[in-house]
A protein has these predicted regions:
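Membrane-water interface segments at the C-terminal ends of transmembrane alpha-helices
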Residues: 17, 24-29, 93-129, 157-163
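Alpha-helical transmembrane segments of integral membrane proteins
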Residues: 53-86, 102, 130-284
């Protein structure tokens, strides 16, 4: 590379300016949603990253909703029936789920699906990719169904792996809440067990979980991790790994910036939810 080319690139990206001017230029571009220009893809970073974010949302949003809908009741039931057969079975499965990496679980499910296909000729769910061949010729609803069909296996993997940890946390919080004096007082007053559990114990047990909701939004950027790589899902993680291997600085920095912004938004939402869940918190 000639010195003239280096000087031109430094001027193009503002690297010849003082540090404070570079920072102000970066803030100006960030406020205008300009995350830079990709060297590898020869396109603005936002145009490259945003479609991948949407693809990851197809997996992350449903798996997060299913996580709360399944893991919370499982944790509550485990706390109410502590050391019962069902609690022991669920605890064993939870520890097993924590021990198995989600990408390895994806490989196991892919193997089982392929075995069913080889034996019966029926492909229960696609094992890779996001769309079928001829996708562009499909109608709108056919496209929706096709993407949803391809998303089933990775969503099952993500939900199963996350349920293990979340249900254990929910169970522990419920056990602690059920041992508190206010629960014994509520029972002594003759309140129905349903009211004691769901209005008093659960509402307090869920507070630490709500406080950690702020960390969920950045997962929309981090995506489904290696599950996307294993299942060839065109999400965030494959693009990030490709950008790192090609030293595409602005794409990597764009990921980090979007993750930081979503983390701040998530923390704000968790604070607002805490005020709704916990009556002791009031914002003036």
């Amino acid at each position: 590379v000639t010195p003239e080319t280096i000087a031109r690139l430094r001027a193009q990206f503002g690297l010849d300016r003082p540090f404070h001017e570079q920072y102000l230029l970066w803030m100006h571009n960030l406020l205008h949603l300009n995350l830079g220009y990709s060297f590898a893809y020869q396109a603005p970073v936002l145009e490259i990253v945003w479609p991948r974010v949407l693809n990851s949302m197809v997996l992350v949003v449903p798996s997060t909703v299913l996580l709360f809908l399944i893991a919370a009741p499982v944790g509550v039931c485990g706390a109410l029936r502590q050391y019962s057969l069902g609690d022991r079975v669920v605890s064993f499965l939870a520890y097993l789920g924590l021990a198995i990496p989600n990408f390895f679980l994806a490989l196991i499910l892919m193997y089982l699906v392929l075995q069913v296909y080889f034996r019966t000729g029926v492909m229960v769910f696609p094992v890779s990719g996001m769309t079928s061949s001829g996708f562009e010729q499909f109608s709108f609803w056919q496209k929706v169904v096709d993407v949803a069909w391809h998303a089933v296996l990775p969503i099952v993997v993500l939900t199963t792996s996350d349920i293990a940890g979340f249900s254990r946390i929910m169970r522990g919080q419920m056990l602690e809440a059920l041992s508190q004096d206010y629960v014994r007082t509520a029972r002594a007053k003759g309140l129905p067990e349903r009211v004691v559990v769901y209005k008093h114990a659960l509402r307090n047990a869920i507070i630490p979980i709500v406080a950690n909701i702020g960390g969920i939004l950045p997962t929309l950027i981090s995506g489904a991790g290696l599950v996307e790589v294993v299942t060839a899902w065109p999400g965030i993680t494959p693009l990030l790994l490709d950008a790192i291997s090609q030293q595409d600085l602005y794409v990597v920095a764009g990921f980090l910036t979007m993750g930081l912004v979503l983390l701040m938004i998530g923390n704000l939402l968790s604070d607002l939810l805490l005020a709704w869940v916990d009556p002791r918190i009031r914002y003036e």
